[in-house]
Amino acid sequence: MTDPEVFCFITKILCAHGGRMTLEELLGEISLPEAQLYELLKAAGPDRFVLLETGDQAGITRSVVATTRARVCRRKYCQRPCDSLHLCKLNLLGRCHYAQSQRNLCKYSHDVLSEQNFQVLKNHELSGLNQEELAVLLVQSDPFFMPEICKSYKGEGRKQICGQPQPCERLHICEHFTRGNCSYLNCLRSHNLMDRKVLAIMREHGLSSDVVQNIQDICNNKHTRRNPPSMRAPHPHRRGGAHRDRSKSRDRFHHNSLEVLSTVSPLGSGPPSPDVTGCKDPLEDVSADVTQKFKYLGTQDRAQLSSVSSKAAGVRGPSQMRASQEFLEDGDPDGLFSRNRSDSSTSRTSAAGFPLVAAQRNEAGAMKMGMPSGHHVEVKGKNEDIDRVPFLNSYIDGVTMEEATVSGILGKRATDNGLEEMILSSNHQKSVAKTQDPQTAGRITDSGQDTAFLHSKYEENPAWPGTSTHNGPNGFSQIMDETPNVSKSSPTGFGIKSAVTGGKEAVYSGVQSLRSHVLAMPGETTTPVQGSNRLPPSPLSSSTSHRVAASGSPGKSSTHASVSPASEPSRMMMMMSDPAEYSLCYIVNPVSPRMDDHGLKEICLDHLYRGCQQVNCNKNHFHLPYRWQLFILPTWMDFQDMEYIERAYCDPQIEIIVIEKHRINFKKMTCDSYPIRRLSTPSFVEKTLNSVFTTKWLWYWRNELNEYTQYGHESPSHTSSEINSAYLESFFHSCPRGVLQFHAGSQNYELSFQGMIQTNIASKTQRHVVRRPVFVSSKDVEQKRRGPDHQPVMPQADALTLFSSPQRNASTVSSNEYEFIELNNQDEEYAKISEQFKASMKQFKIVTIKRIWNQKLWDTFERKKQKMKNKTEMFLFHAVGRIHMDYICKNNFEWILHGNREIRYGKGLCWRRENCDSSHAHGFLEMPLASLGRTASLDSSGLQRK
């Protein structure tokens, strides 16, 4: 194929996978070597493929985002020559209210592949894309598909942000930035599309956070190419000159800007450079070398990659290397790759493995993301019955609030053992020293000479946190409370726990000093803790170097006492700007706003059966088939009593519930302005296995009385439709962006899955459609686990299944046990086992053959089998001692416990096609069959393994 055909093919693959893929995933779809693929992507240029890289402790991840210069014409009637596409964007997205038969009434063309459009696509080398793939590409490339941008938006940090009545329903972002032509180095308008308010508007218009993230990365790439690093030192008389430290829009919490702090000398000697803002970027000399990171993709020679980072580390002296260095918004050295600045869930690392500490700018308003207050909530249903229930859970993804990270104005430095510890810029140390008494400032000390200060929110009662940082499991550094046996309740009794689940610790530097707000238990006194007083690490900590943190509260005196491991654990809680209004917590550690990436969105079915045996399971383990969470920066937090929310959500009549003063909107999936999400088990149509814990979804349409009627059910004034919820759910999973035509009585309808709208083809009447699950309580879950009232129906045996499931008395088997079923010697199954057994052991007689029946293991086997691409089943024998029989029948084989040295057909286990054929010792030996759950009992003189 020629290059244009290859470019179109790569674009088609990317768009079929949502417009973005990692390089490894792309290589799995294309039969090309890595070096050749790199040359193709480089030849296509950033106007076709945006190349990104993110790094963490596991290494550097390279991603490819598809983009195009093709645009949709915005004119309703275009009479002049135009090189843009002429089509209806709502029809492309499946949301146009004009049906296919009435498309001539629409002012825009519904013929996506018209002769004129096909020529435009051919000019842009996109002629091989279908309508769905073209929609994915245009949505993330053409600003025309974004919601309307506020024309009176003046920028951040002003008294009047825009002239529209508040709250403004339009986007508050820089329009020039979305078009790729913003040339202001310090633009007053926001360039952050992942801002929570902007993201909420995007979601209302059908753009998911993943799509918005792709748009953000594409715009960042354009902005970086238009404003290269060489242009980032503006003239003093120009806008954004040296007399301005930075614009107010850059003071905000901006996920797309990088502020690189060079690491100090490993020896940690010498104070930081006093001149922070005047230091030259140590990476400036090697900015061009960043483009070479992808050049050696697929090669074994990494020396040149290492030289890039080593040059950055050695080009300056130790004093300069400690200084805070700064890039502009979206800044990164010129090159083939733009770093994914919005994704701060992983730390930026160089190709040689040295961490690049990303300091993200903070906005005072955006910083104060808090959790809705109140320990109890009022759930209001359609009957206005109020029931007070606990609001938020006392744990967040299994990590306690006392172990939440506390970050303030801390930087990072490299230590001898490779850990990252927090330091302050010298400018900030001086500014704090001028406003505080040295005896009332908490300090963090270590073996080096650098000292970090935390400033209390209450000037008269400063906090004394003694903490240290360590590398977290996801590659981020955090300051943790390290007192063992951490209490399970928060200081104020709300039972809220919080933790960072990913992302780099925020590093704040600048002219203004930011403060860490630390709250202690009522009645506690604050105590200074010296860094040398190291305590045993917390069980959740991954580092061995920790310090305990004690905190102060208003109105309490501070005492200078050392904290011992036996003292009361310190409780850390981040306060809102108005503590009287919000008594719960928020965390100042910014992480990636790609909130869909935090946590795993599918709940593990095996875990619900209490039988997940995978060490690194890629699914969410939870005790319910659903999980409601609230996103409060930087983590998802569980609601405490999820059954109340789930029960309301399952009722299609309920769109909004009020929990005290907080509003949960199921349509927008928000709690006030905070995003919420619902994790779930797979849909019942996704698995051929009829598992009792899959989610059953029901589909409803709203009539003229605003009442919801389930599809397939009759109503007093409407005829039942020919389709039901099961049919819609199956069609929805096979074509989630499609349009389904059906009829009910004499009326014909179209249902758009993307817009969730039902349209009457004749009258053009539109009805709202909702999809809600069937409510399952915790008692229902326990009952399904226990059985025997509910036993899942076994699938029909197919060509690849060696044996069908046995008939058994289900009442005699509990969900956690097994049963032996003796096979009749006239059964076909008995004959197959006997024939294979006697093929190598003719001199022995089979007394009985028993089959092991374990419902849990059988369901697990069937689910795994459905995911296999090459389904090859083998009938194997395995010899094991009687001592292990009960464990294996209950829990299946464990190669660590029951394995041996010979590995032939299974990891650590001796599997054989034929049975053993010689004897040396006498005994009675059983041979369980792992995959099918059967046992052959032999009365023999012993068996010897080859």
Swiss-Prot record:
UniProt record similarity statement: Belongs to the ARTD/PARP family.
Binding to EXOSC5 as annotated region, ranges: 224-254
Zinc finger (C3H1-type): 73-86, 87-113, 150-172, 173-194
Protein name according to UniProt: Zinc finger CCCH-type antiviral protein 1
Gene3D superfamilies: 3.30.720.50, 3.90.228.10, Winged helix-like DNA-binding domain superfamily/Winged helix DNA-binding domain
GO biological process terms, semicolon-separated: cellular response to exogenous dsRNA; defense response to virus; innate immune response; negative regulation of viral genome replication; positive regulation of canonical NF-kappaB signal transduction; positive regulation of mRNA catabolic process; positive regulation of RIG-I signaling pathway; positive regulation of type I interferon production
Entry keyword RNA-binding: yes
GO molecular function: DEAD/H-box RNA helicase binding; NAD+ poly-ADP-ribosyltransferase activity; RNA binding; zinc ion binding
Subcellular location: Cytoplasm; Nucleus
Species name: Mus musculus
UniProt-annotated stretches for the region N-terminal domain: 1-254
Span of the annotated motif Nuclear export signal: 283-290
Gene that specifies this protein: Zc3hav1
Highest rank taxon of the organism: Eukaryota
SUPFAM superfamilies in UniProt: ADP-ribosylation (SSF56399), WWE domain (SSF117839)
